[in-house]
From Swiss-Prot:
It catalyses: L-aspartate(89)-[ribosomal protein uS12]-hydrogen + (sulfur carrier)-SH + AH2 + 2 S-adenosyl-L-methionine = 3-methylsulfanyl-L-aspartate(89)-[ribosomal protein uS12]-hydrogen + (sulfur carrier)-H + 5'-deoxyadenosine + L-methionine + A + S-adenosyl-L-homocysteine + 2 H(+). The keyword Thylakoid does not apply. This is Ribosomal protein uS12 methylthiotransferase RimO. It comes from Thermotoga petrophila (strain ATCC BAA-488 / DSM 13995 / JCM 10881 / RKU-1). Binds 2 [4Fe-4S] clusters. One cluster is coordinated with 3 cysteines and an exchangeable S-adenosyl-L-methionine. The keyword Ubl conjugation does not apply.
Length: 430
């Protein structure tokens, strides 16, 4: 059977699908990269917020429309199916098979048998199997846990991903060792909340132990940690990230807001002052540390005063990178039942205003790198430039660096930064 896989949504989905591809190949199936060549197309979906759901549904219909032309069987899997299985099955009968959130081996067996698979509640997290690159790139996302126990009032993820389930340090290490042997130069650790890693398995926050283990592996590579929940970003985690040489000093901390009133409504426990103190302490210890965050605007009850507090918070912290999202009213969450909904047009205006403010801040923050030498990872070529990233950018969510010089994908080069705009930098190989 020839199987094509299309991934939507977050990096955790990408990691899942590369593991699934490996399981399918171990079972004797061929992984193809063009749907025209596939007997079966697996579409992995996202259901986090309204925009992601809409994109997933649009892609489902796009693949349904192409079925007759290419003659493949269509399997739709992932978070959207786990959350809306009965509705989807009724509304889109053209889909051949529906699969929710499950273990890769269970998914592979279901695909082979042609049966739907939607667990009542996801209870497993995959054990490492040899994975297959679905894209040529020098980095890999490694999922260290699945599910979440945090209970943010705006978030629907626990309802379809289940409670926290951590992989063992040994299992993750085996996966990373294989990825390094294959030539990966950056290992990006992902989860719904990386700070919670190990609480279920080791009865403690085990991220520092995991980082120390991975840092001890041989080779030249970066370790990047994403999705650090601010309420549980401890001094031990911060110290490990700052002290270990292969861990990049990049802190992805989704604070979500800067108004104490809104933070409380969101179910967050740290106040804005506590957040400022924590983030400032990182910069005091490592001035060039990169701080990235995510913000939700238009949360129920957000007034102009709250929004002004948010802007003041952002200006004071001076985040290097910031993603701003309009609140998505998700059925089944605590926030769904909150009154005082913000007008969508008002929320959109606030998003645009915040992003304009952040563009100025990002531009100013990049000034410190002009004239500096930075390690650069080659990811491709665009015209006369090599394209890639330094340790200061995460893939897909941040800007890129354009460099004049010679190199190939996966090379680490030393470059000097010459100029920048709000998001991207330009330099040359030394």
């Amino acid at each position: 059977m020839r199987v094509g896989i299309k991934v939507l949504g977050c990096p955790k989905n990408e990691a899942d699908c590369e593991v699934l591809a490996g399981v399918l190949r171990e079972g004797g199936h061929e992984i193809v990269f063009d749907v025209k060549d596939a007997d079966v197309v697996v579409l992995d979906t996202c259901a986090f917020i309204e925009d992601a759901k809409r994109e997933s549904i649009d892609e489902i219909f796009s693949f349904v429309d192409a079925k007759d032309q290419y003659g493949y069987k269509l399997v739709v899997k992932g978070c959207l199916v786990q959350r809306y299985y009965e509705e989807l099955k009724k509304e889109v009968p053209e889909v051949d098979q529906w699969i929710g959130v499950a273990d890769p081996e269970e998914i592979a067996n279901a695909i082979e048998n042609g049966t739907d698979l939607v667990p009542d509640q996801p209870e497993t997290v995959y054990r490492y199997r040899k994975r297959i690159d679905l894209e040529e790139r020098p980095y890999a996302y490694v999922k260290i846990s699945d599910g979440c126990d945090r209970g943010c009032t705006f978030c629907s993820i626990p309802s379809f991903k289940g409670s926290l389930r951590s992989r063992s340090i040994e299992d993750i290490t085996r996966e990373v060792e294989d990825l390094l042997k294959e030539g990966k130069k950056e290992i990006i650790l992902v989860a719904q909340d990386t700070t919670s890693y190990g609480i279920d398995l080791y009865r403690k926050q085990a991220l520092p132990d995991l980082l120390r283990r991975l840092n001890s592996l041989n080779g030249e590579f970066w370790i990047r940690v994403m999705y650090l929940h601010p309420d549980h970003l401890t001094e031990e985690i911060i110290s490990a990230m700052l002290e270990l040489d292969k861990v990049v000093k990049y802190f992805d901390v989704p604070v979500q807001h800067g108004s104490d009133k809104i933070l409380k409504l969101m179910g967050r426990t740290k106040s804005s002052e506590e957040l400022k103190k924590m983030l400032s302490s990182i910069r005091e210890r490592f001035p060039d540390a990169v701080l990235r965050t995510s913000i939700i605007v238009g949360f129920p009850g957000e007034t102009e005063e709250d929004f002004e507090e948010l802007k003041q918070f952002v200006e004071e912290i001076q985040f290097d990178k910031l993603g701003a999202f309009v609140y998505s009213d998700e059925e089944g969450t605590v926030a769904f039942n909150l009154k005082e909904k913000v007008d969508p047009e008002m929320a959109k205006r606030r998003q645009e205003e915040l992003l304009l403010l952040q563009a100025e801040i990002s531009n100013s923050r990049l000034d410190r790198f002009v004239g500096k030498k930075l390690k650069f990872l080659v990811e491709g070529k665009e015209g006369k430039f090599l394209v890639g990233r330094t340790w200061t950018e995460a893939p897909e969510v941040d800007g890129v660096v354009f460099v004049r010089g010679k190199g190939k994908i996966g090379d680490f080069l030393e470059v000097v930064i010459k100029e920048h705009d709000e998001y991207d930098m330009w330099g040359s190989v030394i």
